[in-house]
Structure formats: C-alpha cells, structure tokens
Amino acid sequence: MTVNPAQVGSAVTDQILGMNLANWFDITQTGVAGALQAAGVKAVRWPGGSASDTFHWQTNTECESGYVNANSTFQNFLTDVVVPAAVDVAVTVNYGSNAACNAGGDPAEAALWVANALSNGNKVSHWTVGNEVYGSWETDLHTVPHDATTYANAVASGFYPQMKAANPNTLVGVVVEPGANWDSIVLGSASYDFVEYHFYAQAPGQESDTYLMQQAAQALTAQIDAVKADLAAAGHASTPIYVGELGSVYSNPGKQTSSITQALYAGQVLGELMNAGVSRSTWWLAFGGCADSSSGNFSSSLYGWQNFGGYMLFSDGIPEYGCSNATPLALGTLLPTARAFQLFSSVAHNGEHVLGATVSGNTTGVRAYAASSGTGTALVVFNLNETTSEAVSVGISGQSSSSGVTVQTYDKALYDQSQSNVWAGPTTVALGAQKLPLTLTLTPWSMNVVIVSP
C-alpha cells in the first residue's frame, strides 16, 4: 500500500469519535465518564433515540409511560459525564409530543432547553429537531404525523427561530432520509444549520459477518453520498452532515454486536466517515443495552464467544436486566467496538487532513485509510481475512525513511481471550527508525494503526 501526501482530502475532525447515551441508563455511576475517555470519545448525543420524542427535560419524564432513570437528569448528565469526560454534546429535542402529551412538540420547550444549556456551561453545540420522525415507529402527535411538510413548517416557523433566539451561535439541525418522499421537501422548506442521518447496516436475523466486514461500511458511504446529492439538489451542498446513529443491526442485537466482527466494521466506518468529510458521528449506544439469546441473533454462523449481545459498547456492569446469565463484567469495561474507537483516536485529530491511500496486489482482504499526523503520517490498516496473516509493504510517496514507526493492533486473537472473560486491549509495538517502504505482517482479523514519523 502507498500513501500519497500530495493527495489531500477532507479535513479531519475528532467529532467523528462519538457515542450515544440514553436517559434510561444511570449515567451518574462511577466509571461512565472514565470509560468514554479510555475509548477516546470526543462527542456524545443525548437523551436517546425514539425516547427523544417523548422526553420532557424540565420534569425528566416521558409521555406514553416511558422509563427515565431518576438520576439521569440533564444537569447530572452535564455534571457527571460531559464535564469530566470533556466531550461535546448534541441534543435531540422533542418534536413528537408536548408536555401535556396531547399534541406535537412545543418549540418553546426546546428553546428553554437551549437557553438552559447556554447558561449552564454552553456544552451543547448541536440541537436536532426530533429523532427519526419520518418513521411510523416514532411518537408524533401532530395532526398529520410523520409528514415532511408538517415537519418542515414546524421547524421553519417555530423550532428554528425560537431556538436560535435563545442562542444565536448554536447549531440547529433537521433529520434526513435520502429520497424524494422526505428530503426534497424538508431540505427545500425547513431552516437548518446541519442535517442528521442514521445508518444501521443490517436487519435483525439477517446478520452476516462477511457482509458486515466486507461491504457494510462502503454501503454507509453510498448513503452519505445520497444525502450529499439531496443537499445539492436543495441548493445546500455545503451543509454539514452529522451521522447521529450508527450500528450493525437496527433492532434485536445479538452476539455480533459484542464480537471482533463489529469492531472491524466500526473501524472501517470511522475511516469512511473521515474520508467523506462527515462533521460528526455518534454510535448507538455507549451504555444501556444488554440482551441475551432470547431476543437477538446468536446463530453459530456468527463469530463470537458471548452468551450476550446488545448495543452497549461498554459493559453496563453485567449481569443485569436483559442478560441475567452473563458472566460478571465490571461497569465500563471496553468491549471490542470501543477498542476500535480507542485505536482510531490516535488518528482522528483536529487540524489533520485525509491523505490518499492505495492498496494494490493480491490483498483482497486488506483495507487502508490515511491521514496526516503532525509532520508525519497515520494509517489505519485492516486485515479482513479470518485465518490468514497478510504481509504488506507500506510506503509513503517521496519518503525513503522514517525516524520512528509505531504499530497498534487489535485483532481476533486478543478478542478470543474474552472466551475466558479477559477483555484485552490493543498491543503497541515501537519499531524505531525504518527504511521505507517497510513490510508489516497483519494478523488475521485485525485493525492496525501505523504512525510513521518523518
């Protein structure tokens, strides 16, 4: 593989290193903020997915008898997570329901939240109006629910002007779903500073390790391109794109979510987001989603050792509700996908730029991404072959030597230690000064971060 420093792409932002937190999980527990820091997380989204359209922040309650953890107030979220973890915040305001739970969301309630956040440390940079309000699964008590015109008008005439009046410098966004039925109306009629898109690679029961690792991340890029096309058609080609939810399966997560396979998918997703110039992303979900074999896909065709799965990227402190038979694992323990974030945090630094990375030869299972790294170069290289190591030549155009090369690796062998409930982290090897190109051996099913100094 060859990196071309002259082929400069998008600016890199650490805001792609984001995760969701949910208001049903007690975020005041010791270890939550520390886990986010350990994984290199720089951005979070609150208060949840569909819960956002039933949640009322002033009373910390939800319509439709939704459960909210009493400790997980907005104030506690700021105090116990945001400040100690030093993360930037995106909030989804309630479009679906008013405080009386008998009509659509109230822009005044959203504006008061913006004002509260401004006076409370100004930690929230992004505000999205509603969650997946284009879908019938979402609470929407407007007279015409799940309707693009109703949504666009509500944003343009109510939410956007009132929220911007509360804080003119904040960013207010709308939800998008590529296609003429939603985006053409919303993007042409609403007011917005950014758009928010959600992506899940697979349907429950149809999970495939091969698809997830070999094709799913590239499918995300195709969808981002579709959003860009919709924005361009609306005359807003430069509008930032925020991928607010990411995952491998859109419901009933099984053992794939706790496996090395999802970690390798997540690492590629971060590479694709970086290459695409996405301004921000938050994976679903940091804590609060353990599930056992009674609900998700635990097929023997999927690789993994656990009798639990779930959206959580860190242990909730299992066993717990939803996976009562799981082997005990301390709260905050990094699961495989969190390790992918940890590795990528060595690459996704503000002020850097994407660089061209070309893979050639008989290495069909190898993927690579590259970015500047100070005066050096950072590569993220994947071996997607399950049983075979790959010897690859790594070169940088115009550079014949390096004063120091460091390689960080998370792979199948490290994950396999979890069969004994040992959740090992990445290894780091300092190779010292090297002539370029140099040959690296990539272990089976591995994500590798290679830092090449000048």
Provide a role label for each language-model segment.
Residues 1-193:
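N-terminal catalytic cores of secreted or lumenal carbohydrate-active enzymes
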Residues 19, 40, 113, 127, ...:
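Conserved, mostly hydrophobic/aromatic
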Residues 41-57, 283, 287-293, 407-418:
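Short, solvent-exposed beta-strand-terminating loops
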Residues 110-113, 146-272, 276:
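Noncatalytic carbohydrate-binding groove/subsite architecture in carbohydrate-active enzymes
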Residues 133-134, 178, 200, 247, ...:
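Catalytic metal-binding/acid-base residues of hydrolase active sites
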Residues 248-348, 352-367:
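Aromatic/acidic polysaccharide-binding cleft in carbohydrate-active enzymes
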Residues 361-401, 407-410, 445-448:
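Carbohydrate-binding surface patches
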Residues 399-444:
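Acidic, Ser/Thr/Pro-rich beta/coil linker or hinge segments at domain junctions
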